[in-house]
């Protein structure tokens, strides 16, 4: 069998991996084998953390809504129950922004649930 020279194909593949790992520390951005391993690991972390980011933001929003609700003498769960009972369908992201930046509107929403 004749020898196959795949010079530019291999170089292109290695170059692509090394470009993806630019900015990594030490050999992780210089040596192909370690760079390839770190690239695989980085992609795994990225996919895991996309789901984790959604979780973290939801926790942050709930904490902010709870702080706003406590100022009104309610717990988070009581407030959300009142919203559902009154048919107020505002998502947690917007409620958290209202509780943090526009407390007057947030307080009016809470007052509306008392009626």
UniProtKB/Swiss-Prot annotation:
Ordered alphabetically, the record's keywords are:
Chloroplast, Plastid, Ribonucleoprotein, Ribosomal protein, RNA-binding, rRNA-binding
GO terms of biological process kind:
ribosomal large subunit assembly; translation
Q: Matching InterPro entries, A to Z?
A: Ribosomal_bL20, RIBOSOMAL_L20_CS, Ribosomal_protein_bL20_C
Give the main location. Answer: plastid
* A Pfam entry, by short name: Ribosomal_L20
Record PANTHER family:
39S RIBOSOMAL PROTEIN L20
Explain the purpose of this protein: Binds directly to 23S ribosomal RNA and is necessary for the in vitro assembly process of the 50S ribosomal subunit. It is not involved in the protein synthesizing functions of that subunit.
In its UniProt entry, what is this protein called? Answer: Large ribosomal subunit protein bL20c
- Give the organism, scientific name: Chlorokybus atmophyticus
